[in-house]
Amino acid sequence: MFTIKEIERQARVKLLDTYEDNYRFKPTEIFDAMRDGLRMIRNVRPESKYVDGLLTGKMLVINGTESDFTVPESFPATIGGTTYTLDQFRAFTVNMEDRWMESLVYYVIHQMYMKDDTDTANAQLAQAYYTKFTESVRS
């Protein structure tokens, strides 16, 4: 399993969006794309719901407990009665085996480039990363 922070970091590196004081994409935008990507992977590959041979019901693990992937509008945020900072949210574990991580990164990048699709180059990049996503999920 891997953390939200790991996916965000890998996506930002490929998006050339690593200057923390001036991110082009807000963390919540990346988290929304991540949640949607997890849903896509689970729909296309139902076996992705299994971790170490056990069926998982929820997309995140928060403090050892499975949880839905709810993206707050801002931080600090209250989830399930507990308030979390942005860094604490980033430390949540994604309830999926590591082999799906690369596919999820591709999906996040695709979604971020879709936001900039008025730029022809970004529209092409969005399509290229969606193709990488679909190929990696289906292989």
For each predicted feature, which ranges?
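Glycine-enriched, solvent-exposed interface loops adjoining structured elements
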Residues: 1-139
